[in-house]
Amino acid sequence: MRIPDYLIPRCPHCGAPLSMNLRADSTFVEDKGWHAAASRYDDFLRRHKNLKVLFWELGTGYNTPGIIKYPFWQMTAAWPDAFYACINLEQAEIPLEIQNKSIGISKDAREVIENLLTGV
């Protein structure tokens, strides 16, 4: 499958193809806005540590597992009322340590969410 050139977003200044902001190389943007969002996320985690929390992972792979996957596993193991749900077509893996408070669904995330919304 080939994507037509006109569908590829381009930089408005130089015309270069844009890329996703992934922590994969030196192009990752970690600016003031990123740090503000990280601070809000840390605050959310701090305020909800002793409450019922669902760590819901949608299609997260192993490109940068230290950002989402591993912290979710660690918090699920450490927090008494945390539950981990992983929906991933190919990698719905659950560590042995948290299997009793987790669910892994090996299906397309869109299909699962549509089923949840329609009560199927």
Residue ranges and their predicted role:
Residues 1-120:
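Conserved catalytic alpha/beta core of Sir2/sirtuin-type deacylases, generalized to analogous enzyme cores
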